[in-house]
Design a protein with these regions (language model features):
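N-terminal beta1-alpha1 cap of cysteine-dependent amidohydrolase-like domains
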Residues: 9-14, 19-96, 105, 202-222
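Generic structural signal for residues in well-ordered beta-strands
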Residues: 52-55, 118, 170
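Histidine-centered divalent metal-coordination motifs
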Residues: 104, 155, 195
Length: 222
């Protein structure tokens, strides 16, 4: 039995799905930024790998304790990155050492860590799906994803194009040209502003699968 947050509330069902990448043996951390969608990410990772990831809230684990993980997923969350416990310090510490995938607040934190800014929107997005456009095809996140796709949005902040960090690259935008996804040019860091774990993002699980498969490929060979 599992329960997912399906945009209109929690729905529980029996899981009979086998894992997609059942040969993967990884230690995956989901850093929970106190968001109701975090456990959708958890269940996606379980479906993909056949194993539950570790989940810690951003004030329940130390930065040092993260060092032995093979991949880090930064969950969505309320507020701004500076209010999210060890979120930004985790990115600073493990950038270039452990593959990182950020969702919503996670993208905003990555932007700030590398010297960028976030800006407050005049119109808040809450539980709506809008069209996204991939503008960089050779990314981990969007491998085998259509150039345009629908994705769920729950946010009032975005990464600003003003003073956008040279180290980062915009990989997807919305219809207004706002930043909807990015990656680091050198490190294994990618992030999305939308919610891949929402039922309103049909290709979302594939995006997370892409990240996990890539992170697994970066593990040192025994």
């Amino acid at each position: 039995m599992r329960c997912l947050y399906l945009d209109v509330g929690y729905t529980c069902f029996i899981n009979t799905q086998t894992s997609i990448l059942n040969t993967i043996n990884m230690k995956i951390l989901i850093l929970d930024n106190y968001d109701s969608f975090t456990y959708n990410l958890v269940h996606y990772v379980e479906d993909i790998t056949g194993k539950l990831p570790d989940v810690y809230r951003n004030d329940e684990i130390s930065v040092d304790e993260i060092k032995n993980y093979d991949a880090i997923i930064l969950s969505p969350g309320p507020g701004i990155p500076d209010e999210a416990g060890i979120l930004k310090e985790t990115i600073k510490t493990y950038a270039g050492r452990i593959p990182i995938f950020g969702v919503c607040l996670g993208l905003q934190a990555i932007t700030e860590v590398f010297g960028g800014e976030i800006e407050n929107l005049n119109d808040v997005f809450h539980g709506v799906a809008t069209e996204m456009k991939v503008i960089q095809n050779n990314t981990v996140t969007f491998k085998n994803i259509p150039e345009t796709f629908e994705a769920a949005r729950y946010h009032s902040w975005i990464a600003s194009r003003n003073n956008f960090p040279e180290e980062l690259e915009i990989t997807a935008i919305d219809e207004d040209g706002s930043i909807m996804a990015l990656r680091h040019k050198e490190f294994a860091i990618e992030a999305v502003q939308f919610h891949p774990e929402s039922i309103l993002t049909p290709d979302g699980k594939k995006m997370i699968q892409n990240f996990i498969a890539f992170a697994e490929s970066q593990k040192p060979k025994a």
